[in-house]
Amino acid sequence: MKLYCLSGHPTLPCNVLKFKSTTIMLDCGLDMTSTLNFLPLPLVQSPRLSKLPGLVLKDGSTFLDKELKECSGHVFVDSVPEFCLPETELLDLSTVDVILISNYHCMMALPYITEYTGFTGTVYATEPTVQIGRLLMEELVNSIERVPKAQSASTWKNKEVQRLLPAPLKDAVEVSMWRKCYTMPEVNAALSKIQLVGYSQKIELFGAVQVTPLSSGYALGSSNWIIQSHYEKVSYVSGSSLLTTHPQPMDQASLKNSDVLILTGLTQIPTANPDGMVGEFCSNLAMTVRNGGNVLVPCYPSGVIYDLLECLYQYIDSAGLSNVPFYFISPVANSSLEFSQIFAEWLCHNKQTKVYLPEPPFPHAELIQTNKLKHYPSIHGDFSNDFKQPCVIFTGHPSLRFGDVVHFMELWGKSSLNTVIFTEPDFSYLDALAPYQPLAMKCVYCPIDTRLNFIQVSKLLKEVQPLHVVCPEQYTQPPPSQSHRTDLMIDCQPPPMSYRRAEVLTLPYKRRYEKIEIMPELADSLVPLEIKPGISLATVSAMLHTKDNKHVLQLPPKPPQPPTSKKRKRVSDDVPECKPLKPLLSGSIPVDQFVQTLEKHGFSDVKVEDTAKGHIVLLQEAETLIQIEEDSTHIICDNDEPLRVKLRDLVLKFLQKF
């Protein structure tokens, strides 16, 4: 059993598990933090960005001034943002049989895998994961394609050039794996390979293993996966939550009795309480609006935004914000809000019951009906007619490198009345803001991450008690910025096995058993022999038939009849020859009785010596030695076959044949 780690990002995993002749990819997350090294893509020409000076190296060289620009002490690539792909050279990805997706954030690299590696297998995911994943990909493609860049920067990626650059470009890793965004035809082709599954649905893979998705409690349709054979069980836990938000609660019971538990996707901000962050979000939003400022919330079009809108629904009136407009701007805003209302079966119990009242599960439906929340595909068209200030705008992308958020950062960044509130934990907010400096608007960091923290993980592992835990190396040591916090790491016994990008782990669990069926007619022919009270054994002479990883014992073929004619026999008519079996022996040889038997048969001067494993019987006159051990007996005599046969027969009198 081997695990190939293709991603270095613990919350955007991509691993490949080789288990029982199947090759299973576990998620294909796309590391977008690489985009922080690029300049933003403004929707309209930005004089500020276009006037940024080109990079001059320490030796005065200016050959990179077209590719790299300086802004407030930072260096950025002036090109279309690129994303860090999972490893594609560690193993041949065309050999991957299936891809299991745990949630919509962990499928963003899917088009790169399915369309560029020769992959011909099947992808399994739940319906909400596929539909919302499609929305995220569509928004990503739309945001980048609508702002085309004339130039493409690649010279700086040369290793000899990169080492001359200032940080963080100098320290950027895996730049050879950075790629431009895929296209919508590639997205559609990738999604066409997905087969929809439901929670607890058992899927057979080639008769070798069975995979089952379980609710992980993190997002709509998010899943953990059980991968098991008849005697082995691997649990894949990725992006799970024990908090009561909108998705179905996490299924923990099914994770018990795992031989190996692969753990990824823990919270990125273990010291922040999600409830406290929501409270800070609401209070900072209200304070800004009361002072006449605007609030910008960079976000994804699904997920935390549903919970934020629900909190604001309860908070608006009490905070005196009834007349403040809320705008949700995304090319997929309408689809996202509608999908959240129709996936009732994937919601927590409280929201499911509302569907049968009938009421919309999420209160943002009422916010839309009362015109308190308005959604638009972009800042053009209807939005420009309806736009009123002060207001609150939810829009993407959280990296601040593309999407409508770039326009509002340029528009509102010069006023200290305005506030940008970061709620998504995927990007460093200081790095996200770097190309907008100097910035007058206030910045508030309220990261909301409902995934498991280390205390919850420790409790979970004690409850499910896996034999072995495997996790990213980041989880086996405290965060670099808080090296004294030993509580911010996984603590379990035995210690977890850790992995890093481009590593191959040989998992410690080895297969011990294989299930074999026996045909009824063969079972009827067996004659068990009792060798101990309550224990019977029978020898089996059979033919093993294996197909689709299922093994069946069948009656041995009958000996072939001699041909009645001189026709040539076809190869397919050949029947494997079944040789007669030698009888098996069981039992033990009582040494004292054996010596008496030897003496009765004319052997004198018999001596017995004890050994660590049994006894040695010496027949001194015959110069013969008999080794008697727990699981074997050896007769050693020089070139005297009649004597050996006689002694063998005496030994056999004490053993049972079957």
UniProtKB/Swiss-Prot annotation:
UniProt subunit comment: Component of the Integrator complex, composed of core subunits INTS1, INTS2, INTS3, INTS4, INTS5, INTS6, INTS7, INTS8, INTS9/RC74, INTS10, INTS11/CPSF3L, INTS12, INTS13, INTS14 and INTS15. The core complex associates with protein phosphatase 2A subunits PPP2CA and PPP2R1A, to form the Integrator-PP2A (INTAC) complex. INTS9 is part of the RNA endonuclease subcomplex, composed of INTS4, INTS9, INTS11 and inositol hexakisphosphate (InsP6).
Task: Recite the lineage of the species.
Answer: Eukaryota, Metazoa, Chordata, Craniata, Vertebrata
Lineage, top-rank taxon, reads Eukaryota
Q: Which family does it belong to?
A: Belongs to the metallo-beta-lactamase superfamily. RNA-metabolizing metallo-beta-lactamase-like family. INTS9 subfamily.
Q: Is DNA repair one of the keywords? A: no
In its keyword annotation, does this UniProt entry include Cytoplasm?
Answer: yes
State the function annotated in the UniProt record.
Answer: Component of the integrator complex, a multiprotein complex that terminates RNA polymerase II (Pol II) transcription in the promoter-proximal region of genes.
Q: What is its main location?
A: nucleus
Gene, per the UniProt record? INTS9
Localization, UniProt: Nucleus; Cytoplasm
Q: PANTHER family attached here?
A: INTEGRATOR COMPLEX SUBUNIT 9 (PTHR46094:SF1)
Segments of this protein annotated with the region Disordered: 550-574
Gene Ontology terms: cellular component:
cytoplasm; INTAC complex; integrator complex; nucleus
Q: What is this protein called?
A: Integrator complex subunit 9
Keywords in alphabetical order: Cytoplasm, Nucleus
- The organism named in the record is Gallus gallus
Q: Which SMART domains match?
A: Beta-Casp
> What are its GO biological-process terms?
RNA polymerase II transcription initiation surveillance; snRNA 3'-end processing
